Amino acid sequence: IIMMPASDSMLATANQMCSDAGVYFGTMFRTINDEEIKKEVYDSEYYAGGCNEEDEEAAYNIVKNMAGQGVGNLCVINIAKGDTSSDLRDKGVEKGVKETGINLLNTTYGIAAQTDMTKTIESYIAAYPELDGILLAGTYCDAALPTIEKALSDHGMAGKVKVGRIDFDFTMGEYLKNDTFHVAYGGQQQIDPLLSTVILVNRVIGTPIVEDKPFNLITNYLELTSSEEADEYLKYFLGKNAVFTPEEIKDTMIKYYDDSINEDTFKEIMKNFTVADVAARHEGMED
């Protein structure tokens, strides 16, 4: 079983259920922050490990990037408080604004509907005439970026307010080209589930990446700041082919076929993983 634990508390129950049933499990997208729960899960013979990204570091880096683009007064939109990812991104934003001197005007949490996203942007515009940056640090709202862009455009603010987001989407290129969207961090949607599954499969078939303990891998967020990069992301990450083909997975990630594969193998894979890397490996493949 692969799961995305939005909170640490659910893992204690999941761990017990999987242990009782003799079922291996892994995690994706999230780390475990509660030390007591983490020890309990890591001590389980059925926890294979997983893959998660550096949420705090990504939020910190994107705030620094926006500061470098001239943002001095920032509003932030994030997933609901209590979500592991949201809380870590909050920490990164806090660190970034403290270091750069950006004025954090407002943080809004848990927007799920486009109408609420529009109202939030309009309230920012009305309340903060000094506003010059909006960071979409996380959301489960559909079409969040187009909704933000339309609200800014309707009020004559598109391009005047720098917009950044964590988590790539397929609309970024258009807005980057128009210079109304400015930076995105993401790419984990494609690589985290894949590597979490690979880690679990290796454990289930009896060739774990590391012996006698879970294997957890940290992925780096990728940065996009141009429409050309966004176009390559659309083609090579969201196209017909996965970021690693079945042949690449078999040859480079499944220890059963190559017993030299180890922890360092995966660290090297992540070190080299970029949009340009995927484009180079898959250039000429059928879309």
What are these regions (language model features)?
Residues 34-36, 84, 114:
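Generic structural signal for helix capping and beta-alpha/helix-loop junctions
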Residues 48-107, 200-234:
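An alpha-beta-alpha
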